[in-house]
Design a protein with these regions (language model features):
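Secreted/periplasmic serine-hydrolase-like ester/acetyl group-modifying domain
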Residues: 15, 28-135
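Active-site-proximal beta-strand/loop segments in catalytic clefts of secreted hydrolases
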Residues: 14-16, 141-144, 170-173, 190
Length: 212
C-alpha cells in the first residue's frame, strides 16, 4: 500500500521502540481500532487476519466493524463535519510540561536477557524496510525529555548498518534532555520544541545530503 498511489523521494520514519519492535503484554488488537473503518481497502483485511484469524469472520458484521466509531462516523460521513478540521498531520501542543505529573512507562526489559523483542512487530518492520529502502529511507529518533537507554536502539542500529540506511538519533541530545521548555510531557514536544527540532532535523538532513 505504501507505494501504490505515490512514490515519495524521501521517507522519514519515526522510530518508537515500544511501538516498532519491543514486546508488549497487551493485545495487538489495540492497533486495529483506527483501521476498522478502512477494512475494505486493499491490503487492510490481511493485517486483521494476521493479528487474529477470527477477525475474518467478525468483520463480516457491519455492527462489529463500526461499533467503536459510530459517533465519529455519523459526524464525518452523514453530517459532513470533520473532527480534525484544520489538522494536516500535525497538532501543536502548547504549554510546558509539569514534572510532577511524569509517569514513565516500563519497557519490556529482562535483567538477565536484556530487552525483549517482538517477532511479530519485527516482521512488519522488515516488510516496511524492504519496500521503503529504495525510496531514500531515513530513520529518525525524536528528542525525549527522559534520557533513553542506548541499548534499546540496538536493533535499529543493526538494521541501519546492514542495509546502509541513515539513522538520525536525537533521543539523548543534551539540548533537549530534561529541558522543560521544549516538552508537553515526557515523550511529546510542545509547539516550541517541535519548531526547534524541525530546524535541527533539517540541518542534519542537509549534512547528510538527504534531499539530493
Amino acid at each position: 500500500m505504501l507505494l501504490d498511489r505515490y512514490t515519495p523521494k524521501t521517507i522519514l520514519y519515526e522510530v518508537t521502540p515500544s511501538f516498532d519492535y519491543l514486546h508488549e503484554e497487551k493485545s495487538y488488537h489495540k492497533y486495529l481500532y483506527k483501521l476498522k473503518r478502512h477494512y475494505d481497502r486493499n491490503g487492510i483485511d490481511s493485517i486483521f487476519w494476521d493479528v487474529d484469524r477470527t477477525e475474518r469472520y467478525k468483520m463480516l458484521s457491519g455492527t462489529y466493524q463500526h461499533n467503536s466509531s459510530f459517533l465519529q462516523n455519523l459526524i464525518v460521513y452523514f453530517l459532513g463535519l470533520s473532527t480534525d478540521t484544520g489538522i494536516k498531520g500535525y497538532r501543536p501542543l502548547y504549554g510546558e510540561m509539569d514534572t510532577m505529573k511524569i509517569k514513565r512507562g516500563k519497557l519490556a526489559y529482562d535483567s538477565s536477557k536484556g530487552y525483549r523483542y517482538d517477532s511479530f512487530k519485527m516482521r512488519y518492520l522488515f516488510n516496511f524496510l524492504q519496500k521503503a529502502k529504495k525510496q531514500n529511507l531515513i530513520f529518525v529518533v525524536s528528542p525525549m525529555w527522559y534520557e533513553m537507554d542506548t541499548l534499546v536502539l540496538e536493533p535499529i542500529r543493526e538494521i541501519c548498518k546492514e542495509n546502509d540506511i541513515p539513522l538520525i538519533d536525537f533521543s539523548n541530545n543534551p539540548k533537549y534532555v530534561h529541558n522543560n521548555k521544549f516538552f508537553k510531557d515526557g515523550t511529546h514536544l510542545n509547539a516550541i520544541g517541535a519548531d526547534e527540532f524541525t530546524h535541527d532535523l533539517i540541518v542534519e538532513l542537509r549534512k547528510q545530503r538527504a534531499f539530493q
